[in-house]
Amino acid sequence: MKIWKNILNIILALAVPIGLLFISMMIGEGVLDLFLDILNINYDDLSYLEEKAFAMFIPLLIIALTLLVTFLHHRSLRPLRLSTGFLSKETYKNYGIGIGIVFIFLSLIQS
């Protein structure tokens, strides 16, 4: 049973950051389009570095806020307990490792 729990934690550690990244990128794209429309800036006028900065800032912000909320929830007086260990301290460490792996992989792809 412990092996399946470890496998589940590894899958969650990689799936949660990837899922958060793609969801926040979709939200970030909408916010970026709205922001550029308000300022009346053509997307083609942005430099490559500005495009990458705009594209990654909002996903990083959403992931950071999500992890902060889950950490604060875990540290609260009544932390949520699931039988799979979804919100255990070990899983939070795995999330950190998973986020590191995902962003290292993304930085290698973009370079």
Swiss-Prot record:
Main location: membrane
Regions that span the bilayer: 7-27, 53-73
Subcellular compartments: Cell membrane
GO CC list: plasma membrane
Membrane topology designation: Multi-pass membrane protein
Highest rank taxon of the organism: Bacteria
Keyword terms: Cell membrane, Membrane, Plasmid, Transmembrane, Transmembrane helix
Name the record gives this protein: Uncharacterized protein pXO2-65/BXB0087/GBAA_pXO2_0087
Organism: Bacillus anthracis
